[in-house]
């Protein structure tokens, strides 16, 4: 009989717990979905939020590792609550999505490529408004696609929540210490430091970010130095990605500027050393105005950074890889593949 206190037994119990929570979430979804429906089809568009205190863990196909050395005191997010996992209230392509929040122990999960290994790697930065991390919609589902293209995928679960407050005249203000950026920079250093063991080329490690994760990708692309004190040899590696893909990013455009102006927010740094960048955005995005991508793209161009921008009339916000009636949701993955070929990554 297996020892119930062994690491294997504890791991098995956590998998069972995760499965039970998924069932509970699904039950909550099915029960609540009757109230919010579209008039045209009767299909649900919103569901009741259900959350439970638990730590998000990757499935058996991923190798989940801590970002920071054990015992190192790192800054906690803006809450003492234990980590939670729950579902968003808005269905995406008729399906629920899962988030993690109150993350104080950030991790990265490595998913190996399927088929021939191109030795390229992509660090996935999900969105969630810096309040949560969209772990499946803009995380594991993205990694499923990336690994099918022969690339290693790394999913970052970064520290949240961290509020972007509104100060004088209700103007948004960036946090002084951006914890998600620290986690992203740490992950890039670890990936380069461990490149040979992960089977990746240390010069072909990029990022793909969604919504708030798009801003995080931009911040990592332009930071000239680390935003924390180095802790080990991994922090001697470059923390700048080799390429960057941003989908419907926010926190970039200065919304105080006239609508015709494309001025960046004061906290956005632009470096001539930023990597080749691809921006994808829908013009009717109700959450993060398309001007976030426009302003950032033009600033990169003015700095001499290679940048491509693809805008669609419709598509909304936070669709991930889930297909809807909007062409952007089905066409952007192939755009990314062709762009990666053009910049010499694949």
Language model regions located:
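Short beta-strand/loop motif that positions the catalytic acidic residue
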Residues: 279-281, 285
